Design a protein with these regions (language model features):
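Short, charged, solvent-exposed linker or helix-capping segments at domain edges/interfaces
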Residues: 1-2, 85-93
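Flexible ATP-lid and adjacent glycine-rich G1/G2 motifs of the Bergerat
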Residues: 1-67
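Two-component histidine kinase transmitter core
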Residues: 49, 80-84
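Catalytic phosphate/metal-binding cores of nucleic-acid and nucleotide-processing enzymes, i.e., regions
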Residues: 66-69, 81
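Short, cationic low-complexity segments
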Residues: 90-112
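Amphipathic alpha-helical interaction surfaces in cytosolic regulatory modules
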Residues: 114-192
Length: 193
């Protein structure tokens, strides 16, 4: 965590979920945990008193505190013997397949709800936390599921400031409430001026 300038275990988990996260870029691509978690039915990481649980079939990702009974990290990987999931499909989902693409790992999905503890996304600093490291991707999908509203500064940081600094990155959204959609469209319109 210190090497990457992260302030908490939660920030480390958030970075893992983005993909392309490694402290040793010459030795590791930062894709291992990301793709392994997507290729399972259930993937659990227990470390430093926190648990990351990914239930791929349900599309559910949870982070919670647990009792830190032992040192180190525990990994649970479950997949049904008759799983219909193919590793090739997992890689394709996070690969830009357009003609101009190099077919690398250049697409990520961010579950916005996992980036706050209070349930509200208002501040510019919260948006910056989400955006940290995303300049490495060409396509960013922001999933706003269970996010009721975002603030003006939050939306402005993503859709005007970040987007203007990185015009070649495509930012997509899904599962927006009416409140979120209003602020996102407002920020996009301001960015066009």
């Amino acid at each position: 965590m210190k090497k990457k300038g992260l302030r908490s275990v939660i920030e480390a988990i958030q970075d893992l979920l983005k993909g392309k996260t490694t402290t040793m870029p010459k030795s590791h691509s930062g894709e291992g945990i990301f793709f392994t978690s997507k290729a399972s039915d259930l993937f659990i990481l227990d470390s430093f008193g926190h648990q990351l649980s990914i239930q791929t079939l349900l599309g559910d990702v949870k982070v919670k505190q647990i009792s830190a009974s032992k040192r180190g990290t525990r990994v649970i990987f479950e997949i049904s013997v008759d799983s219909k999931l193919h590793l090739n499909d997992v890689f394709k989902k996070f690969t830009n397949l357009t003609d101009s693409s190099d077919f690398g790992f250049d697409k990520t999905e961010i579950r916005v709800k996992l980036y706050t503890t209070s349930g509200v996304h208002i501040s510019r600093s919260q948006a910056r936390r989400i955006l940290t490291g995303l300049e490495k991707f060409k396509i960013i999908l922001l999933d706003f599921d269970k996010v009721p509203v975002v603030g003006q500064a939050f939306a402005d940081e993503i859709y005007r400031v970040f987007q203007n600094a990185h015009p070649d990155i495509l930012i997509q959204e899904e599962n927006m409430s009416e409140g979120v959609k209003f602020m996102v469209e407002r920020a996009k319109n301001e960015a066009r001026k």
